[in-house]
Amino acid sequence: MSLGSMARALATFLILVLLHYTLRPLLGWRAPMDFLIHALLLASIRVRPAVGALIGLALGIVSDSLTPDSLGAGAIAMTVVGYLASWLKAVFFADNIALNAFFFFLGKWVFDLIYFIVEHRLGGIELVQQLLLWSPLSAAATAVAGVLLLFVMRPLLEPAKV
């Protein structure tokens, strides 16, 4: 990875983290899009699985620091998602919009499944409702936002023409 492509990837990562903490709270949706998952997935497909897991762990610890009730749940979930995204990059590393949307959807849904099961705040029918209704809706919103971000941020994500 060249210095220029590394700088563009870092800029994209920081923009997505900034959007997560500025734009997402303003929307206030019940099934919100998750820009941290976008940042994690886009960073993880560019590195080896262990580094993807470390990126996920770091993002998870940062996001969990804001919600001490569920400290560690986000770190575990993002570590698993970062590892799996990096491991599956050969399958999903295509310029196919539907495949990228499915990649974002699956990444967010797996994160939510792990997060809400490990968190232990919900139980019974509330957990089932969260995992089978609200999490897929949030994953769909994340996938739509991810595809739109791929179109908007294409100059930052493509390798430089030499």
Residue ranges and their predicted role:
Residues M1-V162:
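Terminal, non-globular segments
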